[in-house]
Amino acid sequence: MMLSRAKPAVGRGVQPTDKKKKKGRKIPKLEELLSKRDFTGAITLLEFKRHVGEEEEDTNLWIGYCAFHLGDYKRALEEYENATKEENCNSEVWVNLACTYFFLGMYKQAEAAGFKASKSRLQNRLLFHLAHKFNDEKKLMSFHQNLQDVTEDQLSLASIHYMRSHYQEAIDIYKRILLDNREYLALNVYVALCYYKLDYYDVSQEVLAVYLQQIPDSTIALNLKACNHFRLYNGRAAEAELKSLMDNASSSFEFAKELIRHNLVVFRGGEGALQVLPPLVDVIPEARLNLVIYYLRQDDVQEAYNLIKDLEPTTPQEYILKGVVNAALGQEMGSRDHMKIAQQFFQLVGGSASECDTIPGRQCMASCFFLLKQFDDVLIYLNSFKSYFYNDDIFNFNYAQAKAATGNTSEGEEAFLLIQSEKMKNDYIYLSWLARCYIMNKKPRLAWELYLKMETSGESFSLLQLIANDCYKMGQFYYSAKAFDVLERLDPNPEYWEGKRGACVGIFQMIVAGREPKETLREVLHLLRSTGNTQVEYMIRIMKKWAKENRVPI
């Protein structure tokens, strides 16, 4: 939800005016326009005077100042650069130039210009923010110590807290300033944004309402309101909130259009992602992350990895996403290195003081222990927020696996059956774990039916092996024999005949003991006859003899 800092918010063209309306109207003074924050009018006046030869002192600096406040940073840059080339250039020009470089994302140039300026609170604030951009903790602390207890410096400190994910610290500063300056309405938006980042979406809405009562058409506030609706309700509700913005966003607010296009992709579940997000990757920070998420949802793990591999994570969200991508790539490639990186990222977030008691933090710890195959620990964390994810397919998928892995196949089966996603239900991991749960819960027929619904493939062959072996271990010899029979026909491996022979003997013993219907013997004989092994005739002869003695029709 950051603004575009690389594109001018206002073009250079002066809007044509009606000369008749202007006739007789007094030309306003520059001071009047600046006091009203009419920067467009001020630039128009300054350019007019420049054109007719009535240029005032420092005209280029005033044009640069107005362009900067309109978001036309390229125009401001041009004016300030020209000013620095003049003789006896005021040293304050350098700090203004540095601020312009900063908003254009040209941080090295901003630092160089900043050090040419005379020492001032503005210079210190600028260098403070640049130290954050460069991840230079030593310089950051040095400039931090120079901050004073004045509004501008405290707002700068709050901004750094926000960017370092220290949202509560930022809120404390904003609230303290608001106590003495109720007229600083925009601070309510900053407070609301911090609460949004802390996942307190309802509180964010309440704080935001204070600002929207006074400024109902604010682009940033309406966008944040839409984001809150997305989190509290759904994408449709969020999109409805953005409608007025889409209708009213003027050409002078290009960043608003970029922001709206980006958020609509998110609200619509990724629709149009490949058309909208790539050009915004270096404009809106979240665009890269959301494009990575899109690729993951499309199972294009390699593209997701290519997009995020060079990103140096600084926020919990970035650490989490890098962890997810590395885990997915590790599973796809069978790479232990990627799995270890993922586990470390998850542990870093889940173990941090700021995230350990949040749901994302606990999800990270669950993921960390999942990768370490410590499923008892996985369940401790999953159970701590289970009530929030009752109908969430991904949660139920992980919860079911953890339950089954710890031997609680009854609850594992129950969780697997809650899953609604057809894509997930056709995944081999889902099918194999559910089959195992069915077998352990003495429902081998349901496991066999899972196999029958599958098309012939390597995965169906693997499921057959699982059914054959697990049913054998559980004494469910009938379905074990059926599975080994199919395996033997698909691959004449002696091991499959041995498994089938043992399963058939097991069924026969259960029939003799009265624990299996006598009618099953007919099918056992049919399974044995499909094998060309020399041992078959001896086994069939014994079974037939018993059937004859016990009057069992075969």
UniProtKB/Swiss-Prot annotation:
Subunit structure of this chain's protein: Component of the IFT complex B. Interacts with IFT46; the interaction is direct.
UniProt key word Zinc-finger: no
GO terms under cellular component: centrosome; ciliary basal body; ciliary base; cilium; intraciliary transport particle B; neuron projection
Top-rank lineage group of the source organism: Eukaryota
Protein name: Intraflagellar transport protein 56
Listed InterPro entries: TPR-like_helical_dom_sf, TPR_rpt, TTC26
Coiled-coil regions listed in the entry: none
Pfam families linked to this entry: ANAPC3
Keywords (A to Z) from UniProt: Cell projection, Cilium, Protein transport, Repeat, TPR repeat, Transport
Any Gene Ontology biological process: smoothened signaling pathway
Region of interest: Disordered: 1-26
PANTHER family: INTRAFLAGELLAR TRANSPORT PROTEIN 56
UniProt TPR repeat ranges: 57-90, 92-125, 151-184, 468-501
One annotated GO molecular function: intraciliary transport particle B binding
Subcellular location: Cell projection, Cilium
UniProt keyword Manganese, yes or no: no
Family affiliation: Belongs to the IFT56 family.
Annotated function: Component of the intraflagellar transport (IFT) complex B required for transport of proteins in the motile cilium. Required for transport of specific ciliary cargo proteins related to motility, while it is neither required for IFT complex B assembly or motion nor for cilium assembly. Required for efficient coupling between the accumulation of GLI2 and GLI3 at the ciliary tips and their dissociation from the negative regulator SUFU. Plays a key role in maintaining the integrity of the IFT complex B and the proper ciliary localization of the IFT complex B components.
